[in-house]
Amino acid sequence: MKIFNKQPFLIAEIGVNFYDIAEKEGISDMDAAKLMIDEAKACGVDAVKFQSYKAETIASQNSSAYWDLSEEPTESQFEMFKKFDKFGKEEYRQLSEYCKQVGIMFLSTPFDFDSADYLDEFMDIYKISSSDLTNIPFIKYIASKNKPSLLSTGAATMREIKDAVKAIEDTSLVKLR
């Protein structure tokens, strides 16, 4: 399966930034996400990438903020993530379909098993966050879907990277290149 049809293959990181655009512009979250897709396409980007999660799966309700509170007043990690987890399967289906209409690849990094499952029908490739690079059970779960995976390796050691790659190679039918 050939995924990347050119080099360099450019991926625009939308993440959850569309929520801020929606608030600033006074438009719906979906319209803001589509606006960012349109802007990425106009810039010549090959793919757009979102982030899919539920706050309950990635942060303790008691975890305190680690960011500058003068910039973002939310005082807990859980509440911060909760602000940006409004989209689910149906919304990502709509974004995937919209990406097909405009001719850009849709990606979303799953941060939990449920997200990995519902995103499977919308994506040809998975993106694994650097925050999950040492989460070998999750990496194996994604690899078991037998689709190519992109691994983010920010702040990782060579050992952690090798372990993650081995987990994919041991589980997936898709060969890494």
Protein language model regions, located:
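Active-site-adjacent beta->alpha loops and helix N-cap segments on the catalytic face
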Residues: 8, 88-92, 115, 128-168
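N-terminal amphipathic alpha-helix/helix-capping segment at the start of soluble metabolic enzymes
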Residues: 1-15
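Short, acidic/polar
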Residues: 25-40, 110-116
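Hydrophobic faces of well-ordered beta-strands that scaffold small-molecule active sites
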Residues: 10-14, 48-50, 106-109, 126-128, ...
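Conserved, mostly hydrophobic/aromatic
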Residues: 13, 40, 119, 152
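Active-site beta->alpha loop and helix N-cap motifs at the rims of alpha/beta catalytic domains
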Residues: 70-136
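Catalytic domains of carbohydrate-active enzymes, especially glycoside hydrolases
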Residues: 32-53, 122
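Glycine-rich, proline-tolerant flexible connector loops at the mouths of alpha/beta enzymes
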Residues: 18, 46-86
